[in-house]
């Protein structure tokens, strides 16, 4: 199912998902350093593999994904299938509602 068919996202629910599943490796705080994964501030509209100061895999740089709701929705289903060779070890969020909620939170928190 594509993002066009996704349920409406709830940013509050997405924040809980971020804190339990993403926060260990990522931050959304402007000006914060990178963790194991890159800082996600300014994520929307950015190309994959381009955050200054973070060492990305060649796969992530070469894929040149433009991060928007649609691409994140597909990526978060199965990151290793979407970008083979990515360093992200997260297996993905299988439930469409979880992905929609997380994207709604990221849209708010990374702007």
Swiss-Prot record:
Q: What protein am I looking at?
A: Cytochrome c
Briefly, what is this protein's role?
A: Electron carrier protein. The oxidized form of the cytochrome c heme group can accept an electron from the heme group of the cytochrome c1 subunit of cytochrome reductase. Cytochrome c then transfers this electron to the cytochrome oxidase complex, the final protein carrier in the mitochondrial electron-transport chain.
Look up keyword Mitochondrion and say if it applies: yes
Q: Which InterPro entries match?
A: Cyt_c-like_dom, Cyt_c-like_dom_sf, Cyt_c_1A/1B
The signal peptide stretch is none
Describe PTMs of this protein: Binds 1 heme c group covalently per subunit.
A single cellular component GO annotation: mitochondrial intermembrane space
């Amino acid at each position: 199912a594509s993002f066009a068919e996704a349920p409406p996202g709830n940013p509050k629910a997405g924040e809980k998902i971020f804190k339990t599943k993403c926060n260990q490796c990522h931050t959304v705080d402007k000006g914060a350093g990178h963790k194991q994964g890159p800082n996600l501030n300014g994520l929307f509209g950015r190309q994959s593999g381009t955050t200054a100061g973070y060492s990305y895999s060649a796969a992530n740089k070469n894929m040149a994904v433009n991060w928007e709701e649609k691409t994140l929705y597909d990526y978060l289903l199965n990151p290793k299938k979407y970008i083979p060779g990515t360093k992200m070890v997260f297996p993905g969020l299988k439930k469409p509602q979880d992905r929609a909620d997380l994207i709604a939170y990221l849209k708010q928190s990374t702007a």
